Design a protein with these regions (language model features):
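Positively charged, small/polar-rich N-terminal and surface patches that mediate targeting and assembly
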Residues: 1-100
Length: 100
């Protein structure tokens, strides 16, 4: 099992949800995620701090999935970054084990 943490600018949050839903439909898997809004931080683009200087914020998606999904989500992220240059979208994958 894999955990994928996806951080996107709130400006493209709805597009990520749309693309992820399309992917889940294509792969015939249930579209599951946890979404955390108002995430502050700085990556490869301008800071997203939700203040007067850096007003934008990020959204964090946490997805637990089968081992074959990270490669497909990687392609989804490449699509987002190509369409929205400079907005900020990154994904990180790790191995996880369900407890209980």
């Amino acid at each position: 099992m894999k955990r994928i943490d996806i951080i996107v600018s709130q400006a493209i949050k709805d597009d990520f949800i749309e693309y992820y839903t399309e992917l889940c439909t294509t792969e015939k898997v249930k579209c599951k995620f946890t979404m955390i809004d108002n995430v502050m931080g700085q990556g490869n683009t301008n800071p997203k701090m939700g203040d007067a200087i850096w007003p934008q914020l990020n959204t964090l998606f946490i997805i637990f999935c089968d081992d074959n999904m990270p490669e497909k989500i990687s392609k989804l992220m490449a699509r987002l970054n190509k369409e929205y240059i400079g907005e900020g979208a990154a994904a990180f994958v790790s191995d996880v084990e369900e407890l209980g």
